[in-house]
Amino acid sequence: MGLAREKFKTLTEQMFYVLLCLQQECCGNDILLRVPEMTAGRVTIGSGTLYNLLEQFLEEGMIVETKVEGRKRSYQIAEKGCSMLRQEYERLNAQAEDYRRFTGRCSK
């Protein structure tokens, strides 16, 4: 099991959507705008949280820095990040399937 998988055993919603955004090259401000748009406002990310996540993802090799223009930096997901995103998607689907199989009184 890789270090990224151990450190990020599961992804928070915010982590999931940051990685989802980074399938296309974008800067932090793009992410701050896209996540609420993607989730109809259900998920928002503060700028401090976002830049902390980006730094952690860079350190773990989950994203790469693609462009630096003054203070503006752009990023894109790396293969390790793609793998984590797929694993989290599969985990969430398994969780939803468990709910469908085992729900009783709460399904009404």
Give the label of every model feature segment.
Residues 5-49:
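N-terminal helix-turn-helix DNA-binding core of bacterial DNA-binding proteins
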Residues 86-108:
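Amphipathic alpha-helical dimerization/coiled-coil segments
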Residues 70-89:
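Basic, amphipathic "hinge/linker" alpha-helix immediately C-terminal to the N-terminal HTH DNA-binding motif
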Residues 31, 57, 92:
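Alpha-helical transition-metal enzyme core signature, strongest for iron centers
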Residues 1-11, 92-95, 101:
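Intrinsically disordered, low-complexity serine/threonine- and proline-rich regulatory segments
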Residues 58-70, 76:
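Beta-hairpin "wing" of winged helix-turn-helix
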Residues 49-50, 81:
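Helical "lid/switch" subdomain of P-loop NTPase nucleotide-binding domains
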